[in-house]
């Protein structure tokens, strides 16, 4: 959140390139048009109009869900992520760090490639669930003149009825629902080790699968 002004400047650069626009379509209409590979009327606006609306957008003049910033991608692409995905949305809730300073917040596919480049990341390791998003993120990097990273993707092994997401686990631990990262009811490596299951057992299991 400390880089919001930088993210705003990159968003404005996309608008000036005529590669992003403010869209006022409701969620249902947007989903329907994207599904059918059709453009909405908002896409046809002039750059100067989008810049004016972007200014109002970041000043918080729109309600939540009233407007979003979308990338001009390829509405006929077989990869639906490329069909004018949302880059920014309005969120009025108070931010734990920035308070009420910002009202327009970036989506994952926008801030992720920018932050990776700003931090000098050269290698990305992530699970295959993000595979469809690589095309959009590389497209953004090309438009914004950002460095690309080498990406290594891997399969993900899930255990039914258990969560392995760090954010969710942290919240449950902080709320007191679980005693800690080694709570035997969890399936973290620490918890499994406490139950006598060593990490090498999972390496062998994955090999067999």
Where are the regions a protein language model picked out?
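Active-site cores that bind ATP or allylic diphosphates and position pyrophosphate for catalysis
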Residues: 6, 10-169
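Scaffold signal of the M16-like zinc-metallopeptidase fold and its non-catalytic homologs
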Residues: 164-181, 185
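Secondary-structure capping and boundary motifs in well-ordered enzyme cores
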Residues: 3-6, 103, 194, 198
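Charged, low-complexity surface patches
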Residues: 3, 130, 181
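Extended, domain-scale alpha-helical bundle/helix-rich regions
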Residues: 180-209
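Hydrophobic alpha-helix position signal
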Residues: 14, 141, 172-173, 192, ...
């Amino acid at each position: 959140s400390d880089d919001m002004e930088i993210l705003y400047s990159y968003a404005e650069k996309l608008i000036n390139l005529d590669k992003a626009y403010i869209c006022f379509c409701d969620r249902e209409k947007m989903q329907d048009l994207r599904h059918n590979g059709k453009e909405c009327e908002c896409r046809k606006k002039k750059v100067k109009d989008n810049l004016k609306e972007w200014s109002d957008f970041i000043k918080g003049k729109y309600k939540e869900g009233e407007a979003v910033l979308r990338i001009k991608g390829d509405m006929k692409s077989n990869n639906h992520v490329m069909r004018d995905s949302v880059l920014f949305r309005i969120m009025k809730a108070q931010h734990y760090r920035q308070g009420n300073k910002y009202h327009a917040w970036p989506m994952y596919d926008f801030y992720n490639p920018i932050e990776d480049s700003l931090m000098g990341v050269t290698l990305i390791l992530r699970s295959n669930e993000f595979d469809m998003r690589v095309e959009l993120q590389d497209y953004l990097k090309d438009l914004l003149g950002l460095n690309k990273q080498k990406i290594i993707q891997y399969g993900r092994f899930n255990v039914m009825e258990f969560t392995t997401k760090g954010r969710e686990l942290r919240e449950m631990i902080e709320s007191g629902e679980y005693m800690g990262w080694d709570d035997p009811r969890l399936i973290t490596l620490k918890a499994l080790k406490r139950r006598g299951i060593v990490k090498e057992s999972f390496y062998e299991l994955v090999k067999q699968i």
